[in-house]
Amino acid sequence: YYRDDFFRDADPKKMLVFSGWRFVPKAIALLTSHEAEQRIAPRGRLWEGDDRPPLRFTEKGSFHIFDVCLPSPALARLVEPSALASDALTAKELLRRTRKALKRALEEAGVQVAATSRSPIWQVVARLDRHSGSPIRKALEGSAAYNGDDITERFAEHVDTFVDWMEEGGSLRISEERLTHLARIAAFSPAVSILRAFWTTYPDSCGEVHERLVDLCFGELRSYFNRRTVRAIVERSVPAGRGYVRAAIEYCERAHFQAVADEYLYLVKNVLQRNGPAEMAEHLARVLGVGTGSPNIN
């Protein structure tokens, strides 16, 4: 949907291999993925026994996970990359448009943009979601993770805090720097991108958030980005010293995650006949949970 420096002026291309076979492509994919995993930093920090996944909830507060995993309708509405594809924007230009739309939405919600911040970034998003009439609270509180089948013992605590922020009044203030970061989340976060893909694939669900999508984003999607091989790929794609959450979002920007999600959901709906958001979320959960394992060949 936008031009970038990685592919430069090259047109996107696809290569179809063994299109008439059913078993062989899966076998090749399995073996190729296994070989690739063996070559991706088999030694080092990520493979040490005491390594901890970065997207984990702790008692100290872990709202940075929301950057990657919260499908916020208020953020998803700010921009529709597919609708801007004909404008031939760069990723930076798309980010600027998103930032402009976000700043306008913040002003309408009564959030001040200033030189410094005094409000947590997700408290600001909670205000945006409340102001826009977002159904995110119902989706969060209706998710299986929140109601007994908890992905972690801390997830429900974070949801309760977010809901409390939605109910609070008072003034909020966000800095220009955090405004840009939040615009990047709105444009490129995988969870927000998947939510937009659901809306374009199932137009009747536009503006809604299914509870199963919340479970998908905070469950299988979060686990996927916690995988050591995924982390190695993401961390290699950004400058050294970049925090993992920021790196994951920038990777989704470079990898055109929104376009990939839109096309994949379109194909799954129309080829595999996944007829609704709940069924699609279940399918994506299985896809994100697939691992290469240790294949044996007879």
Question: Language model features by range: what are they?
Answer:
Residues 1-298:
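Helicase motor interdomain insertion/brace
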